[in-house]
Amino acid sequence: MAEIAKLRESIESLSAQLGQRDARIAELERLLDESRRSGKRQAAPFSKASPVEEPAKPGRKRGDAHGRHGHRMAPVGPIDRELSAPLPSCCPDCGGELELERTAEQFQVDLPPPRPVVTRFNVDVGRCVGCGKRVQGRHAEQTSDALGAASSQVGPVAKSWAAWLHYGLGLSFQKTSALLARLGVNLTAGAISQAAQSTSTALVPVENSIVAAVNGSKMIVPDESGWRVGGESAWLWAAATTRATCYWVADGRGFDQACQVVSPEFGGVMVRDGWAPYRRFDKATHQTCLAHLLRRCDELISDLPAWARSTPRRVRELLSEALDARNLDDAERAVVVADLAERVELLADDAHPHDENRKLVAHLYAEREALFTFLAHPDVDATNWRAEQAIRPAVVNRKVWGGNRTWRGAETQGRMMSVLRTAAQQRVDAIDFLTRLARAPTPADVPPLFT
């Protein structure tokens, strides 16, 4: 009896130790996952591997055996200046007389010294003889009817450049102000912000046309990323299509926030990651991002013990076969889809060691109707790369200057980014578009963005 009691005591002790270790393992896995996610949010991602001890010398190798060596072509068009570089009076080595053999050409393309253009509008002011109403003239290049104390203004080209530098290239308002000052235009950071808000108001009809184009598309690719408004957490959303992209900042990342732009009645194809609120667009045909699933498989293969790696390997193999099937004809793809769908069902029925594997398989099964849409519709993307590319510049901007101070600024942020990104997709010069917008005397004269 004493021996049995001792064994029971030993078993209880070991069970307690195993319980503590299981809890510790779960905590370490949570910290690892949190660390991995945090690493993706850093301004400077960590390197993928240790530096090579003897890296290859940068640049192209010399000689014709290493392919064509590119060079800058001579400029086409009129030459603005011609300068001569005559021979020196004598040989710099021995002092001997020099004989001219030929005159060669060298070209240099450079920026001219910055000089702002100052325009004075001579505005005629009159009064109607019949009703006494005051009337004044307006030139096509004017952006305002203000006279008197408000008669000196910064023109639309400079303001459009400022908007493009801040919302398009990610310069802060302060740096944008400094750059414009170097070009001869004095515009404070506050004035740039106010000008952007004024432009944003004029862009409401343009934004509405972008939203309509997004919802009228056959395929929408949405994504969201963390944002800041007034130092508080918010979310930047993007909905990308082949023709237009819409951005908006919201106070959350749920279904209601997504519906601020994407209609809940959208009936096209939605290519998105596995975030659950996207599934509530029940009128849409869904395609979940396979790249996210493959990355998760790679993480599990790297993190899990050897005895638990078979499940993520099976999932990775299944998804890789699906991607490889894109080059097959319609009939062959249909056969592959049926086979892969059956394998997903079998995978869900199997027992899987380790909680993380069970989570992976449960998620895969929940997404089973959205795994292989791209094989049934070849014009559908298999990943949400469009949205990730669309949202990446904004993420860089957030890491540079932190987000927006006010919700009005956040509204301007989304609207300006939508116009700039869509203009690029439409091959429209964004600066020229914003300039023409500023000069439009009425909303009816706003230039079209879509070609």
Predicted regions located by residue number:
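Catalytic center-proximal scaffold of phosphoryl-transfer enzymes
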Residues: 16-19, 88, 121-127, 132-451
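Short, flexible loop/hinge motifs at secondary-structure junctions
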Residues: 1-150, 222
